[in-house]
Amino acid sequence: MRKPSNQLGNKMFIINCKNYDEIAGDKIIKIAKISEKVSRKYKVPIAIAPPHHLIPLITKFKITVLAQHVDDKKVGSTTGFMVPEIVKKSKINGSIINHSEHRISEKEIISLVKRLQKLKLKTVLLSHIHI
């Protein structure tokens, strides 16, 4: 399996699957296969951010897999949270942070960006601020 590049520049096509029925169950596999083919054919990096429970179905494909969200929690008794250190061990390449449907505080953003960088995970930071 090809390991996704850490140096993607500033261009990447990201498919955030949200929680739509069109990707439920094995349907996510079809999207991953198509994404892998398109990425290879057009030499464009593609990332898929499926609902967390579907991630294991697509980690075998040669695409970047992103968590839709991670939490600023520690490894241990944190049931129901997506912990960055566990995310890394689950063959996930990075995470979306601060999506408009899952906003977090500035303090959490700063902490998570630092943690993901330390873990060498991709960070897709979204903001509603226009610069």
Where are these regions (language model features)?
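Small/flexible residues
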Residues: P4, Q117-L119
